Design a protein with these regions (language model features):
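N-terminal, polar/charged subdomain of small-to-medium soluble alpha/beta proteins
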Residues: 1-58
């Protein structure tokens, strides 16, 4: 069941820039377009405080 829907702006950035943005925010994830691959990706905080990266295959 979807309880809430949000719209996000997707910005072009490197994976490192996305990691820095995540570090400086309270968000659990950042959705961005990877400048190298030109793919929409998601970097997120893992339960062990490391970061994970989701790169969907199209």
């Amino acid at each position: 069941i979807v309880v809430k829907t949000s719209q996000l702006q997707i910005h072009d950035m490197t994976i490192n820039e996305a990691a820095l943005q995540l570090e400086s925010s309270r968000s659990e994830f950042v959705v961005f377009r990877d400048l190298e691959s030109e793919r929409v990706s998601v970097i997120y905080r893992r339960h062990d405080d490391d970061y994970g990266l989701i790169v969907p295959e199209l």
